[in-house]
Amino acid sequence: MRAVLETADIAIVALYFILVMCIGFFAMWKSNRSTVSGYFLAGRSMTWVAIGASLFVSNIGSEHFIGLAGSGAASGFAVGAWEFNALLLLQLLGWVFIPIYIRSGVYTMPEYLSKRFGGHRIQVYFAALSLILYIFTKLSVDLYSGALFIQESMGWNLYVSVILLIGMTALLTVTGGLVAVIYTDTLQALLMIVGALTLMVISMMEIGGFEEVKRRYMLASPNVTSILLTYNLSNTNSCNVHPKKDALKMLRNPTDEDVPWPGFILGQTPASVWYWCADQVIVQRVLAAKNIAHAKGSTLMAGFLKLLPMFIIVVPGMISRILFADDIACINPEHCMQVCGSRAGCSNIAYPRLVMKLVPVGLRGLMMAVMIAALMSDLDSIFNSASTIFTLDVYKLIRKSASSRELMIVGRIFVAFMVVISIAWVPIIVEMQGGQMYLYIQEVADYLTPPVAALFLLAIFWKRCNEQGAFYGGMAGFILVVVRLTLAFAYRAPECDQPDNRPVFIKDIHYMYVATALFWITGLITVIVSLLTPPPTKEQIRTTTFWSKKSLVVKESCSPKDEPYKMQEKSILRCSENSEVINHVIPNGKSEDSIKGLQPEDVNLLVTCREEGNPVASLGHSEAETPVDAYSNGQAALMGEKERKKEAEDGSRYWKFIDWFCGFKSKSLSKRSLRDLMEEEAVCLQMLEEPPQVKVILNIGLFGVCSLGIFMFVYFSL
């Protein structure tokens, strides 16, 4: 019987919605959303606490509450391996990848590939692949999981609830940008952890403790006789009714169908490297940090938080099987269809069933808010990151002279487009809902991502890797992926009570071993082709590899014919219409003579003037192709249209409100840009500086979190 929302539940859910929207509008009011950096990277102003919380909830979405708990109910501790693996890979992001991304001065991961290898074909390939993954895998999983929870626990109309959630999330993302996303993620992290911990404590008290969970889980089998009498089934066969013998182990033997340890280490880990170290959703948050110390602190915080899902999601899923074995462990497809509407199995209802049966009125509203928080967090992450990739890696290739205002508009329009796609996808999700969809999407992600992970690792750790090697290696991996996916969908797994007549190479080779082969084949082809073709230029590897030296100063030039001006960090250059310097500011009393001995290769920031007087800003010698006449802190301020301010001043109140609502601050931009840019954070390279004491503290934290992660792997695998 489905629960009915009580007044207290409705009040708590409504209060949550009000809080989220207030935070979003607060971000609109306080933050600078009128520039690419301000909207997409929160102006590089976020602290480690906010980013760490955002990293956690960006990953732990509604599909984790449904999927992790469901997998815990079906197969025990195994699924927790992904969480402990993420704990370690987050530190790889903070200590290895993020310093390189900051030094390169990039906003997006396709942009990094373009700077590292040159050209645009790898950039476009990776951008398209990322958008496909976001829209048709992450988005579909989130909507399926959220819809399943809403249907199971609250009985809301599916379409109305999903459309409402998508619409609110899109409004929050469009208006506030990454600042709003990170601020709301901080609230959602607190809400999710408190709610999930509450349910864990209640369920543990019901069972009698963690040791009792392990003992009773191994006995949690459905009563087949009672089920056959109760449901009047025509099919009396039963399958998969008993817990697996190694359910209490995490990493299992090489032939295990869930987590074979060689496949997990050699295949799943590279796939996870892509997600945690090269996925726009994750990396974009860390790039919003004030400096490298805050970036590392955020990955440490997120790493410690990743210890929680094993205990607040997976274990409650196991408890749900203990308490409701006749439903969660349905005995055959006919029984499963009657219980949860899916012939594939009913383990996905483990968490919603636990909420509705154990949680009292009032707290049930809190748990509903937790699930809404998880769903909205994932959706706003996808909306913001996908719009960033589309705007900066696809649209700017089509419209190279696009202004900053135009890029902001396009980013918001693309979010609206994704909302339409999301709503159109709902009927397909309804038709596909069941355990199989979630599992298939996880498998698809493991097929698509290992080749990309191989390219990123080689790009960062091997200077000799070039564009030809990366492109042909990536294409070879992609062709293999398409072949394997085609075979996987052509030969679908049979229902549990039917014989498996699929070919041996489909039936008996675990997808993690396929991911292993894809990763190493892509890497091998990339290495061979790179060695047979010319090496990359020094400019391509100057700031984009692990071995790059830290650039210390800024080079700025206002004429392609003259010698470049060499300037201090936080310097600002302004040009007249005839390409002459009219304002050359060097703070702290430094003179040009003090830096003239530096070589061009020591310089990272370049600003050059075109004949029409608009400089072209470049970081790491990669043209941004946006007309500017001031550049600082890795952020270009649009100044080319000097007469446009009259238009803004003369506009109606309606258009002024629209400009404020969407973050377009064209009015008085030319008057405020110099002062504001002088007051901003140091340029990207200055962000890499760490005080010695802070560095020691961070390294101690690194040792602690990595030790905990390894201990958890060992403890749950023995």
Swiss-Prot record:
Cytoplasmic side: 30-38, 111-123, 184-186, 325-353, 431-443, 533-695
Coiled coil: none
Swiss-Prot/TrEMBL site (Implicated in sodium coupling) positions: G24, R285
Swiss-Prot/TrEMBL keywords: Cell membrane, Glycoprotein, Ion transport, Membrane, Phosphoprotein, Sodium, Sodium transport, Symport, Transmembrane, Transmembrane helix, Transport
Phosphoserine: residues bearing it: S594, S632
Compartmental location: Apical cell membrane; Basolateral cell membrane
PROSITE patterns: NA_SOLUT_SYMP_1, NA_SOLUT_SYMP_2, NA_SOLUT_SYMP_3
Transmembrane segments: 10-29, 39-57, 87-110, 124-144, 158-183, 187-205, 304-324, 354-376, 407-430, 444-462, 511-532, 696-716
GO cellular component term of the entry, any: apical plasma membrane
GO annotation terms (biological process): inositol metabolic process; myo-inositol transport
Membrane topology: Multi-pass membrane protein
Gene Ontology terms for molecular function: D-glucose:sodium symporter activity
Pfam families: SSF
Function (record text): Electrogenic Na(+)-coupled sugar symporter that actively transports myo-inositol and its stereoisomer scyllo-inositol across the plasma membrane, with a Na(+) to sugar coupling ratio of 2:1. Maintains myo-inositol concentration gradient that defines cell volume and fluid balance during osmotic stress, in particular in the fetoplacental unit and central nervous system. Forms coregulatory complexes with voltage-gated K(+) ion channels, allosterically altering ion selectivity, voltage dependence and gating kinetics of the channel.
Protein family (similarity comment): Belongs to the sodium:solute symporter (SSF) (TC 2.A.21) family.
Assembly description: Interacts with KCNQ2 (via the pore module). Interacts with KCNQ1; this interaction is direct. Forms coregulatory complexes with ion channels KCNQ2-KCNQ3 and KCNQ1-KCNE2.
Alphabetical list of NCBIfam families matching this protein: sss
Protein name: Sodium/myo-inositol cotransporter
Organism: Bos taurus (Bovine)
